[in-house]
Amino acid sequence: QFNVMPERYKDYSLLELYDELDISMRYIAYYTEIPSPVGLKYTDKVKINEKEVDSECRLITIDTPYGELTREIRLTSDRNWRTSRSCIKTREDIKKATWLFRNTEFYFIEENFDKGDKFIGDRGEPQFFLPRSPYQSLHVDSSWMTLEDLIYAITDLPSEIEELMNAIDESYDRLYEEIISCRDKVRIINFGENIDAYLLSLKYFEEYLVPFWEKRSNQLRRAGIYTHIHIDGHFRPILKYLKDLPFDGLEALTPEPQGDVLIEEMKEYIGDKVLLDGIPAILFLPIYSREELYSCMEKLIRLFHPRLILGISDEIPEGVDEEGIERVRWISEYCKSFKTGKGDSYGL
């Protein structure tokens, strides 16, 4: 059930729950009610209008010199507004969107980062995720295109779609420059790409994703900022690329039984990169035993420690019962005993 905690924890604040379980925090603007440190603004030329169709449907229209871009959003069962019809369908729509991004600028809000840093305190290193690469932005952010429409556009209108991707990339310039100017406090950055290798071809992976990452991640790394990338889908087709990706860490790689790769294969292919997370989320559901969770956790620690920030790939399932949360506590206690050299199958 959405937005409902098990009875034992129903009155806990987010920070109280983290402290009760003795676990670390990572992201400053994810379920924290802290505003994102990534801002977005348009030039005065951009006009955006929102029209309510009914209580659960709205139309958002963006005026451009080439006509309107319109997307439909609907209120879903989790009470969030989500895109139900994307806005780029035709060659003319691509032209409109290119104009829009030429009049769009992302920027860094240092004040929001400071708020998040204060909120997290000593519970972890404050981090946030960047806007996605142009390819991922166009279809993962479904307000723009469906995956099917993107693939057709790349095939039929390559120059137009690449011009749009360039416009998206350039809209990030100020953001990266301002982050780098705050490198004394911003030390780790996430590329929140949400990669699933079965939703892209290796050709597009090499042509559109890797070059963007090399440009932008290395821009940050040259300034002394560590980077990691969020790969929370299937990733067997890209195993051979992992060790050479321009990141210090790989976040949310998900092994079997939820993903499509063995833990041993992850170890073989990621080289000396830091693994963030690694425990499949479904192991916190009652259909899996603590013994199965322990086996996975112990293997991750044995193979990846000390280049490991143990966590859930990529988050605990919504609607878990009290046992699911108690498994988080149990892992925390195990890890503390592991640090003292006393780790065993605690609590099984």
What do these predicted regions represent?
Residues 4, 20-23, 45, 50, ...:
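Short linear motifs in intrinsically disordered/low-complexity regions
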Residues 44-103:
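A contiguous, low-structure linker/loop signature
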Residues 3-9, 63, 95-348:
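Active-site loop segments of alpha/beta catalytic cores
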Residues 28-29, 40, 79, 97, ...:
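Short, low-complexity intrinsically disordered segments
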